[in-house]
Amino acid sequence: MVIKRLRQIKKEIRVIGVAAQCDPVGITIIGVVFRGSLWLDGVLKTHSAGVDMTEAISEMIKRSQHYGQIRVILLSRFSLPMEAKISSNNLSVNVGRPVIFLGGGEEPIYTWRNRGEQAVFSASGISRWSAESILKASTREGVTPEALRVATLTLSALHNRVDAQGINRTPPG
């Protein structure tokens, strides 16, 4: 795996946070593009028929109008289905962008601390120190980057059909 060197990590670095949830016909995948922890730039959606989401996420990102500006892909074990399989190394190679996987992922695993909280992560295609700088730039509070937090909220709203008033509109049965 080639380690990508990012020249400068600005507070407005564009990252994409990916969240997924199982549905009756496969896995719905949402990607949220954020500028650091400051602005939402876009929302992407795709579907994977199988449990290996690597190819579906790769294609979703490469087809996006944001592809040229996305510098890092953020994943979290806590925003993916338990049965889902994803290779952060293969994703990094396929998309040509580094991947930071919170909550584990593939070896090696590092620990990151922010404002009294800590999280473990793995980094593919980027050094540990660059990954920590990106996590710091893309996180407002705690240890969850804004892109991942908003991707999880968006997926939850779409999947559960919650309207703007917070009322669940999911049909019964």
Regions found by a protein language model. Give the residues of each.
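Charge-biased, low-complexity intrinsically disordered regions
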Residues: M1, T46, M53, S58-I61, ...
